[in-house]
C-alpha cells in the first residue's frame, strides 16, 4: 500500500509525517488518555517516567516505522527553560537506552558580536553548554550562530571551555540566503564529523545542484517579478512562511528574483485597490473569519478586470468564487455561510460532516474529495 500522506521538508530530501511534529500538548494528551484507559494500572502519572517515556516512544516510532538509518530530532526552545526540561530529560534517557555511540548531540548556541568592544563573546555559549551538562547532556558538536567569522582562537576557546573537539566547533554565520548555510557547513566538514560520531559509512555528497540553486538565488538571470500577498495576518509574516518559501522556490525554478510585498486586506477594504497596481501577480492565502474578507473580494475583482495573474488558496479561492458569483453570475448578495449565515446565495457552505464539529484544533478535512 502507498505510504500515508506526508510533506517534504523544506531544504531536505526527506519525508515528514504528522508524527514528526511533537508538541507538549499532544504528549500530555496522549498520557492522560492512556491513564484514563487504565494503561498505567492506577499509577500516579508523573513527568518521569510517563511523560518522558511518551516522548522517547515517539522518537523511536519514527525509526521503527520507516526503517531509516538516522532519526533527526530537534528540541526547540532555550536550555534552562522549564518547558523544554521533559524533552531534554527524555533525550538524555534515550541516549542511554540506545547507547551513546549510536547518537550524536548537536547544540546550537549564540556567539554575539559586541560592537562597542569590537569582539565576539563566548560566555553565552559557555553558560548554555554548562546548563545542558547539568541536565546530563554533553554536546558532541557545537553550531555557533554569529554575525562575524569565528577566528581560530575563538573556536579553540569555545572547544576548551565546552569540552568539545575544535573540529566540532562549527561556525554558522549570517548569510544572504539560508540556502547557502549547508554549503558553509560542508566547507567545515560538519557532515563528516556527524558520520564519524555515528560510525557510519557514506559516499561523498554531490552538492553541485545545490550550488547552482544558490547561485540562481543570489544572481537570478531573468530579472525580477513583484508579487503581492493580500492576507489577514500580514503583520506577522511567519504566518505565511510556507507560501513565502513556495514563491521563492518558484523563482528559483524560473531563474527570477521574487520580490514579495505583504498587503493587509483590511487596508484594501478601507483604502481601495490602488495599492495593487505595481504587482505582476497577486496571491490571496487562507484564513478564518469575516475580518478583511471584503477587501479580498475587492482585490479579486480588480485582478480579474485588469487581467493580473491571481492565485487563491483556501479562503483566497472562496473569495474568488464569491466575487465571480456576485459580479459575473449576477447572484446579488452571494457569500459564504461562514461570514453571512443568512445570505440568499450561499455559494460557499460548511460541509455537512463538519456541522456538529465544535473543537477548533485538528478538525479540518484534508483532501478526499
Give the positions of each predicted feature:
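A short glycine-threonine-serine/GTX helix/turn-capping micro-motif
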Residues: 119-120, 367-369
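Flexible phosphate-sensing "switch/lid" loops adjacent to ATP/NTP-binding sites
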Residues: 4, 8-259, 266-281, 288-289, ...
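Cysteine-nucleophile active-site neighborhood
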Residues: 275-368
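Beta-strand segments within the central parallel beta-sheet cores of soluble alpha/beta enzyme folds
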Residues: 105, 261, 339-341
Amino acid at each position: 500500500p502507498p505510504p500515508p500522506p506526508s510533506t517534504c521538508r523544506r531544504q531536505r530530501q526527506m519525508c515528514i509525517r504528522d508524527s514528526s511534529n511533537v508538541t507538549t500538548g499532544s504528549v500530555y494528551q496522549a498520557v492522560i488518555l492512556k491513564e484514563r484507559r487504565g494503561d498505567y494500572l492506577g499509577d500516579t502519572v508523573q513527568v518521569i517516567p510517563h511523560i518522558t517515556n511518551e516522548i522517547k516512544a515517539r522518537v523511536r516510532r519514527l525509526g521503527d516505522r520507516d526503517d531509516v538509518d538516522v532519526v533527526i530530532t530537534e528540541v526547540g526552545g532555550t536550555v534552562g527553560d522549564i518547558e523544554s526540561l521533559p524533552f531534554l530529560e527524555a533525550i538524555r534517557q534515550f541516549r542511554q537506552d540506545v547507547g551513546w555511540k549510536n547518537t550524536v548531540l548537536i547544540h546550537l548556541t549564540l556567539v554575539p558580536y559586541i560592537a562597542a568592544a569590537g569582539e565576539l563573546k563566548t560566555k553565552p555559549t559557555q553558560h548554555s553548554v554548562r546548563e545542558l551538562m547539568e541536565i546530563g547532556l554533553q554536546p558532541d558538536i557545537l553550531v555557533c550562530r554569529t554575525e562575524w567569522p569565528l577566528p581560530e582562537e575563538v573556536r579553540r576557546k569555545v572547544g576548551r571551555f565546552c569540552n568539545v573537539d575544535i573540529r566540532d566547533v562549527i561556525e554558522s554565520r549570517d548569510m544572504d540566503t539560508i540556502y547557502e548555510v549547508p554549503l558553509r557547513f560542508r566547507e567545515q566538514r560538519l557532515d563528516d564529523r556527524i558520520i564519524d560520531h555515528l560510525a557510519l559509512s557514506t559516499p561523498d555528497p554531490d552538492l553541485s545542484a545545490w550550488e547552482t540553486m544558490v547561485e540562481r538565488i543570489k544572481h537570478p538571470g531573468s530579472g525580477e517579478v513583484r508579487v503581492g500577498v493580500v492576507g489577514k495576518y500580514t503583520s506577522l509574516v511567519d504566518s505565511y512562511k510556507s507560501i513565502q518559501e513556495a514563491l521563492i522556490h518558484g523563482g528559483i525554478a524560473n531563474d527570477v528574483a521574487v520580490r514579495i510585498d505583504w498587503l493587509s486586506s483590511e487596508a484594501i477594504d478601507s483604502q481601495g485597490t490602488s495599492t495593487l497596481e505595481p504587482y505582476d501577480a497577486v496571491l490571496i492565502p487562507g484564513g478564518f473569519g469575516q475580518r478583511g474578507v471584503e477587501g479580498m473580494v475587492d482585490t479579486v475583482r480588480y485582478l480579474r478586470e485588469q487581467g493580473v495573474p491571481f492565485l487563491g488558496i483556501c479562503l483566497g479561492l472562496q473569495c474568488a468564487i464569491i466575487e465571480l458569483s456576485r459580479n459575473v453570475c449576477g447572484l446579488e448578495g452571494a457569500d459564504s455561510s461562514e461570514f453571512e449565515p443568512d445570505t440568499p446565495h450561499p455559494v460557499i457552505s460548511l460541509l455537512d460532516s463538519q456541522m456538529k464539529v465544535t473543537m477548533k484544533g485538528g478538525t479540518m478535512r484534508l483532501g478526499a474529495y
